[in-house]
Amino acid sequence: MKVRVLFFASVADAAGTRSLDVEVEARATVGDLRRKLESERPRLAGKLGKCAAAVNTAVVAATRSLAEGDEVAFLPPVSGGTR
């Protein structure tokens, strides 16, 4: 099945793109997708584990199952601001 993956900020830089369509096995989880992406794109290794994952705009756990057409966003930690 196919899912759409969105990357932001430094993770998009490491991925070399802001979005891509990825083919995953039926009953794949967010964690499975994360491992697949890190395996296929070595520059992502170690980065996606630090990101929150959102499926169809809802933040989810790595154990969340994916469905055909889901949109998965990897959201890197945010820092900065002023005091």
Where are these regions (language model features)?
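Ubiquitin-like/PB1-type beta-grasp interaction modules and other compact soluble beta-rich domains
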Residues: 1-83
